Amino acid sequence: MKNIGINVNTTKDPNKEMLNFIIESIKNIDKSVNIKTYENCMGLDENESSSLDVIIVLGGDGTILNTSRNVLRSKTPILGINIGHLGFLAQVEINSVEAALEKLFRGEYTIEKRDMIQCTYNEGNKIKRYDGLNDVVLYRGIKSRIQRYDVYINDAFYNSFSGDGIIICTSTGSTAYNLSAGGPIIHPLLDVLCLTPMYSQFFASRSIVLDSRSLISISIEKNYEDSFLSIDGQKWVAVNGSQTIKINKSKNKRRLIKFDDAYFNTLREKIIFNAKGCEGGIL
C-alpha cells in the first residue's frame, strides 16, 4: 500500500478538516505512503487511477457513484468513508476511520466486485453510451404527459407501460430509486438486473428481476418528445420518441473494499429503519 488517492467531496468537507484527518491517520500508520488528493473527481480518471493502490472516497454514496463513473475501466478498489447523509455504499463512518485504515494496511479486507449497468442509443450517426453503478432511469419531462413505453427483453416483446418512467437497476442500485418506486431489495452480489415501472397507470405493473445477460430495449411513443435519461441520478440526457434505449450489464465492474460481511446490519440500520416518518421503518 504505497500509493493512495483520496477523492473528497468539498461540499461535505469545505474546510478540509476530514481530509486532513484522513491524511494524518494514514501517515501515523506509514509515513512513507504517497498520498494524492482530488477534489470532486478533478484530475481523477482511468489513467490517473491506474497508478494508485486504492482510492479513498470521502463523501457520501453520491460521491462514490461519481467516482465510479470517472474511473470507469479502472481495477483500483474504492474505499468509501461516509460524511454524507445515508452512506450505504460508503461503509466506513468517520468515527471508525482509524481502525478501518489499520485493517486496510494489514490487508484485513475483502474486495467485492459489483456489477455495473450500461445504456446505449443512437444520436444521428453516433452511438451514445453511458455506464453507471446504480441505475438507468427513463422518465418523462416536467411538462410532459404520462408516457407510454414499449419494453422488449432479448428482442421479445415484454409489455407496454404508461406512467412516469422506467427504472432499470443493478443489484447494488436496488436500494436506491428502485426501492422508492416499490421495487425489491436485491442482495448486491446477485448477478441480475431489475426493471421497475415508475407509478404506472396500471396496478398490475410490477418489477421483474432478470438474468444480467438480458438485453432490455425501451422505445417511447413517437408523439412524446420531452423525455430524459438519467444515469445514477447524476448524469442526464434528453431523448425523444425516435430513439430506442438499450440497457444491459456493463463489461466493467466496480471493486469496493469491505472489512466485514455486515450487509444485513447495514441494510437494517440505514435502509429498513431509516425511512423518515415511519417509526418502524419501511417494512
UniProtKB/Swiss-Prot annotation:
NAD(+) binds at D61, G62, N134, D135, R145, D164, T175, A176, Y177, N178, L179, S180, Q234. The keyword Nucleotide-binding applies. GO terms for biological process: NAD metabolic process; NADP biosynthetic process. Its main location: cytoplasm. The active site is at D61 (proton acceptor). The keyword Kinase applies. Pfam families: NAD_kinase (PF01513), NAD_kinase_C (PF20143). Its cofactor is a divalent metal cation. GO terms for cellular component: cytoplasm. It catalyses: NAD(+) + ATP = ADP + NADP(+) + H(+). It is found in: Cytoplasm. InterPro entries: ATP-NAD_kinase_N, ATP-NAD_kinase_PpnK-typ_C, NAD/diacylglycerol_kinase_sf, NADK. GO terms for molecular function: ATP binding; metal ion binding; NAD binding; NAD+ kinase activity. Its EC number is 2.7.1.23. Keywords: ATP-binding, Cytoplasm, Kinase, NAD, NADP, Nucleotide-binding, Transferase. Belongs to the NAD kinase family. Involved in the regulation of the intracellular balance of NAD and NADP, and is a key enzyme in the biosynthesis of NADP. Catalyzes specifically the phosphorylation on 2'-hydroxyl of the adenosine moiety of NAD to yield NADP. This is NAD kinase. It comes from Clostridium kluyveri (strain ATCC 8527 / DSM 555 / NBRC 12016 / NCIMB 10680 / K1). The gene is nadK.
